């Protein structure tokens, strides 16, 4: 039961941090500087989304620290004892890392509670989110290697995580924008959604290429050329295959959006024809893509608890 609780905490802290980073970044490039910018900023949902992401990641980070404390000490009740928690925080690397995450996320929450909505706020949130996301590389399998190999593996991990944050963090606000556009049925909201989708399409290709490249590097370190057959015979390998299948499905949906559905919406907006059919098609596609992304995060949380094939060498 405790292992499942720790796994759930890992999933939630990953999801919250990825959304905090990626969504803050999306608000900076997705809303742009045009005449609709002021209206986009004044809307309450971007601020609320970031606050929810911070609170979820902060609570999950605390729960993860408590769960690891209970697991290492062998006593569930030690999770609530300050002496046990402080010992884990001061005496272990992952404990210090967890405490730093809690500190950064607490600062992010305080800034959001001040309710100063601006590009400066989003820049700060993206920066703090990037720190939290990158820190996961130091508590994952990237910490297994030392020397130059360790630097390369950890660096690849950091870039992989940040690229995932850019993608996943954009999907949530895009889904919300599409839902708002359908609910309002106004051409202005449809144009806002279309503009954001166009901007994300330009970023998406770079993100996918980065994920593929860093994924290959990470697999080289964790599986190795001599053990690639073990991806079908080990728990880690099978979980990795599931992740790759989910990732492939996300790429198919992303390509459909970029080359078919977004151009259809753009044509509707330009020609002043009905935009609702195109918006509904995009809503369905982006929401499914978001659901797949959540499943990927769950698999990543699981992979962090499993021994990779290279650990058997």
Question: What role is predicted for each listed range?
Answer:
Residues 1-313:
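Polytopic transmembrane helical bundles with strong interfacial aromatic enrichment
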């Amino acid at each position: 039961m405790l292992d499942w609780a720790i796994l759930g905490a890992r999933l939630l802290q990953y999801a919250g941090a990825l959304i905090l980073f990626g969504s803050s970044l999306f608000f900076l490039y997705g809303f742009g500087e045009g005449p609709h910018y002021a209206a986009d900023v004044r809307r309450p949902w971007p601020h609320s989304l970031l606050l929810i992401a911070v609170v979820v990641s902060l609570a999950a980070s605390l729960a993860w620290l408590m769960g690891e404390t209970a697991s290492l000490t062998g006593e569930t009740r030690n999770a609530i004892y300050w002496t046990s928690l402080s010992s884990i925080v001061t005496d272990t690397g992952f404990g210090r890392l967890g405490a730093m995450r809690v500190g950064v996320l607490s600062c992010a929450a305080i800034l959001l509670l001040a309710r100063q909505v601006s590009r400066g706020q989003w820049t700060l949130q993206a920066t703090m989110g990037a720190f939290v996301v990158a820190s996961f590389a130091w508590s994952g399998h990237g910490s297994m290697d030392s020397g130059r190999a360790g630097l390369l593996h950890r660096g690849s991990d950091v870039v992989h995580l940040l690229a995932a944050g850019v993608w996943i963090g954009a999907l949530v606000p895009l889904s919300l924008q599409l839902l708002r556009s359908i609910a309002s049925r106004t051409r202005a909201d449809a144009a806002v959604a279309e503009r954001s989708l166009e901007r994300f399409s330009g970023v998406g290709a770079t993100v996918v290429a980065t994920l593929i490249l860093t994924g290959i590097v990470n697999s080289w370190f964790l599986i190795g050329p001599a053990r690639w057959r073990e991806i079908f015979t080990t728990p880690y390998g099978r979980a990795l295959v599931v992740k790759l299948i989910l990732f492939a499905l996300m790429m198919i949906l992303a390509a459909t959006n970029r080359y078919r559905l977004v151009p259809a919406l753009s044509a509707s907006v330009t020609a002043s024809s009905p935009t609702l059919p195109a918006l509904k098609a995009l809503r369905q596609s982006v929401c499914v893509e978001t659901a797949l992304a959540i499943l990927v995060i769950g698999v990543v949380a699981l992979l962090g608890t499993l021994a990779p094939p290279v650990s058997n060498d």
